[in-house]
Amino acid sequence: MFPGTYRDSLLLLSATRAMHEEDGIGWAAAVMATPANVADLAGRGIGDLGAADANALVLAVQAADGQAADEALDRGRALLFAAEGTRQDPGQAEPQTIGEAVALLPDANVAVVSVPGPYAAIAAHSALTAGLHVLLFSDNVPLDEEIALKDRASGLGKLVMGPGAGTAVLGGVGLGFANAVRPGSVGVVAAAGTGAQEVMTLLDRWGIGVSQVVGVGGRDLSAQVGGRMARDAVRALDADPGTEVILLVSKPPDPDAARTVIDASEHTPVVAACLGMSAAGGMLAGAPLAVTLEDGAVAVARTLGKPVPDLTEGLAGAAAQAVDRLDGGRTAVRGFYTGGTLCYEAQVVLTALLGPVYSNLPLRTDLALPAPAGAPVCLDLGEEEYTQGRPHPMIDPAARRDIMREQAFGDDVAAVLLDVVLGYGSHPDPAGEIAGTCADIVAGGAAVVGYVLGTDGDPQGLDVQRRTLRDAGVIVTPTAARAARVAAAIAARRPALAAAAPA
């Protein structure tokens, strides 16, 4: 334990993954000693933390032996304290404030804030005072503080992207969980992190590309926040000569907030991909309304007059082969997602084809877990109940693998549905980490349907990851929405659904 040693969540996640990768390590955590984390550690038998508080850094492992533990902890310490030994000027003090950091890097125009929620607004206000845009990675920021931050930023002509904004691509530079995408003419404004990643990677793979991707935080299009920052982002993209179409991405927004955001574009056409939302004539404030991310990307391509590849090739045949292998009692779909927006989109698709879907992040409150026997279930494994004391599953797939082992082998399971998210910040081989489990599920009699979110430029390699899944017997689809359709087609014994037009 290191009292008075704060490290941000991104660095903690990286250190946890690094320790977990060491031989002989069954579990690892690099965390701040918040009450919730201390309780989780105590549940694992690590209880002697003395007077630890939220500003104390804790490294912990469960190892096969003492040597393995020492080696893993050494690696975690090296990563967490590396910044203190790698400054260009070893005699230069590490900056303790935003102002000191700007003095060292005067050309900076964006600050990434990743501190505990109660302190996030203070840091973000400091960045605005220093003339910086803000990517606010932190969660648990009070709603009134978010509104105040965004009002101030708007008055200063700056963007506050967040809170909880994990993805942005600004001037070709990816921030947070981002992908290597080609430059193009589509500006993306997203209140959904993996939703932004899905549309930007689809547009890259279709040869279109993006100009900017601005994450605004999941609450921005709520009635309370009213689209404050999304409006400013749309105005900025509308004024950008390199942006020909604007794509708005969100889980169901407040309709009035969404309309004001769309109306903020005076010259540039807007497409709205609002998951599960409906509107008369399929239009919202004059913008085409798409109910899935796939549909949104297709609408953008058509607006630009660009061709869209066949998104259905071979899927009905693959679904038919999977149906032929199923025992009669297998009718359930089980989804295990690392991307929250992809999990939500899957529920939208499955609900239209199979009926109500149960989840820890449900479309309706009455569809919260536990689910009745045989009902479709989709889990967002990036939610707090699954990440407490351990890395996000996009960084460390081990937790998902364990949960799949527990829940995917039931005699009633027809299809297992999953995503693999590539890009900067994600695990170096996420498909490889779950391939063995997928092969075992297929051998046990169920189908596995997977989607790889990524591009050829991502460090993990899109083709490599797809091939790894296919070699394990997984049906791999060209979009996340299409994966949900294939799973539904298998469970319903209606293979043609896999290649049908969206419901």
Q: What are the residue ranges of the model-derived segments?
A:
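Catalytic-core regions of core metabolic enzymes
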Residues: 1-503
